[in-house]
């Protein structure tokens, strides 16, 4: 479980001091909750996010435990270091919008025919309750030939989960090499 501290002051000066000490600035929020300004050790945060097996993970701040998902993050443009992260509290019975990653498996037939695999959507916005939140969408691209694509409507959805994106948007496809 990831443990963090509550930030008392939210100004620029204190944020810079925390970053200098190896902390990642975070905002934790949900509908009906007061925003929590927190900070986590950067290395601990990265380890937990890489090792997690489900989309939501637990954080502990000020003796309270929250189940959260990463809603947004900011990186430094040159060093690529994490600067800020927004975490959304997952409420089991509250319907909300979440970003779910798309995982590609298999080797497309079109790659052997001089095609290029193009993934246009890395995450899809879904609307569901926290208890129904899928960990990821797994798409098998083995049957895709050149100029074929998988659309949002081709994704098999669990019960009580709907995708907010337009049904005719391509998620992954094989295009011809130029």
Curated annotation (Swiss-Prot):
GO terms for biological process: translation. SUPFAM superfamilies: Ribosomal protein L25-like. It holds the Pfam family Ribosomal_L25p. Disulfide bonds: none annotated. GO terms for cellular component: cytosolic large ribosomal subunit. Signal peptide: none annotated. GO terms for molecular function: 5S rRNA binding; structural constituent of ribosome. Keywords: Ribonucleoprotein, Ribosomal protein, RNA-binding, rRNA-binding. Belongs to the bacterial ribosomal protein bL25 family. CTC subfamily. PANTHER family: RIBOSOMAL PROTEIN L25/GLN-TRNA SYNTHETASE, ANTI-CODON-BINDING DOMAIN-CONTAINING PROTEIN, RIBOSOMAL PROTEIN L25_GLN-TRNA SYNTHETASE, ANTI-CODON-BINDING DOMAIN-CONTAINING PROTEIN. This is one of the proteins that binds to the 5S RNA in the ribosome where it forms part of the central protuberance. Part of the 50S ribosomal subunit; part of the 5S rRNA/L5/L18/L25 subcomplex. Contacts the 5S rRNA. Binds to the 5S rRNA independently of L5 and L18. This is Large ribosomal subunit protein bL25.
